[in-house]
């Protein structure tokens, strides 16, 4: 009998368990001399993205009241799913531990007044800032700057996520600016909200 190492195709036998393995799966060693068939970490076949909440503000604007005063950003009336809750204040609460994708949209701008506005937005988890602040300096009296962002986050049940905006007085920043809704006059086109959020996960 030939040694196994010397056997060539088509006489080489298939991997252990392949006859009953599901299509698209791979054999992964368990470190104890055996293994199991499952979905490969780089093979997303069979996975779909589940949309959990999809909120947007209906406010004409979201502007902090004065310089250096924080305003929590809201995303509409709120929505609830089993894994995630979005309330009317803009707070996202994680109900089920897992990995989530958070997608954001903000319409930053200003209306009227002279001088340069200095606008910052930040994210907070359980009341503590995470990541860096995002900054805009807006010198025109009529300006609109769209901003989008997304992140995958592994979060435990009970975690609360919020977003804040501020008109900063640093560098002679003026009391102007915030988030603004815009409405197309062309029939059939939807409003662009001042702020929107979507939370998703793989299932």
Q: Where are the regions a protein language model picked out?
A:
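Extracellular repetitive beta-rich solenoid segments
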Residues: 2-42, 115, 168-171, 201-203
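Extracellular jelly-roll beta-sandwich "head" domains, especially the C-terminal globular C1q domain
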Residues: 41-203
């Amino acid at each position: 009998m030939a040694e196994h190492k010397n056997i060539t195709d088509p006489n080489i036998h298939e991997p252990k368990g392949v006859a009953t393995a599901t299509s698209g799966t791979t054999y992964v060693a368990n470190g104890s001399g055996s293994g199991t068939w499952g979905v490969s970490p780089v093979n997303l076949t069979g996975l779909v993205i589940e949309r959990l909440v999809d909120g947007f503000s209906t406010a004409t604007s979201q502007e902090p009241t004065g310089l250096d005063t924080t305003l929590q950003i809201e995303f509409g009336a709120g929505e609830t799913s089993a894994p995630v809750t979005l309330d009317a204040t803009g707070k996202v609460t994680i109900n089920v531990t897992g990995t989530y994708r958070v997608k954001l949209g903000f319409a930053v701008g200003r209306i009227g007044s002279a001088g340069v506005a200095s606008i910052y937005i930040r994210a907070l988890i359980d009341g503590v800032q995470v990541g860096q602040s995002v900054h805009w300096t807006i010198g025109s009296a009529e300006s609109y700057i769209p901003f989008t962002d997304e992140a995958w986050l592994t979060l435990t049940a009970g975690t609360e996520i919020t977003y804040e905006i501020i008109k900063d007085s640093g560098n002679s920043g003026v009391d102007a600016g915030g988030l603004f809704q815009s409405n197309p006059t062309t029939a059939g086109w939807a409003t662009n909200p001042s702020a929107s959020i979507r939370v998703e996960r793989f299932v």
